[in-house]
Amino acid sequence: MAHARDKAGAVMAMILICETSLIWTSSGSSTASAGNVTGTTAVTTPSPSASGPSTNQSTTLTTTSAPITTTAILSTNTTTVTFTGTTVTPVPTTSNASTINVTTKVTAQNITATEAGTGTSTGVTSNVTTRSSSTTSATTRITNATTLAPTLSSKGTSNATKTTAELPTVPDERQPSLSYGLPLWTLVFVGLTFLMLILIFAAGLMMSAKNKPLDEALLTNAVTRDPSLYKGLV
């Protein structure tokens, strides 16, 4: 009986030591859940087409070298596209394998596309080669300017996406519970361990009560007992 009780006490002490170390480890390594993280805003401005618009697409060009400004208002999405450029020295050019009496004007277009409703402006810069007739002095020639404006505005407004992403909360499996600041699984484990210790203690009391009459009988027995029977217990 003495050896059995010593072993039970040692087992209970080891269990309590292990539980204490687990509690300290869990409370020390537990981290709070991350809060909402605000993402960044990405605005992309596409570059103009590599091939560029064809030579029959032009803004308002005159024979003078003064700055040129043309504003085109698109009826589809009410987006205003403003073309601003400056003409340079005219040079002869050919078209369709035939020399024609025209002069070429290179216009550096600073295109500003203003998105309807938001007021957001997207800038696109491209070098566009346009032609103006030299026979019409001090006059203006516009050829298919309406086809150039929608192409550039669609690149400047449709692809200029603005996204502000709010990342979702990352779930934390070891998030502290409301009671005692410990994870829930730790509290459950500790509760089951204490329940097991209570059952072991109750079983010990039952065995002690069961063996009590036998101990009293051995102590009150008048028959001479052989000391060698208790040699291992003393």
Curated annotation (Swiss-Prot):
The chain crosses the membrane at residues 187-207. Residues 29-62, 116-138 are annotated as: Disordered. It comes from the Viruses. GO terms for cellular component: membrane. It is a single-pass membrane protein. Disulfide bonds: none annotated. Residues 1-28 form the signal peptide. It is found in: Membrane. Its main location: membrane. Glycans are attached at residues 36, 56, 77, 96, 101, 110, 127, 144, 159. Keywords: Glycoprotein, Late protein, Membrane, Signal, Transmembrane, Transmembrane helix. Belongs to the Epstein-Barr virus BDLF3 protein family. This is Glycoprotein BDLF3. The lineage of its organism: Viruses, Duplodnaviria, Heunggongvirae, Peploviricota, Herviviricetes.
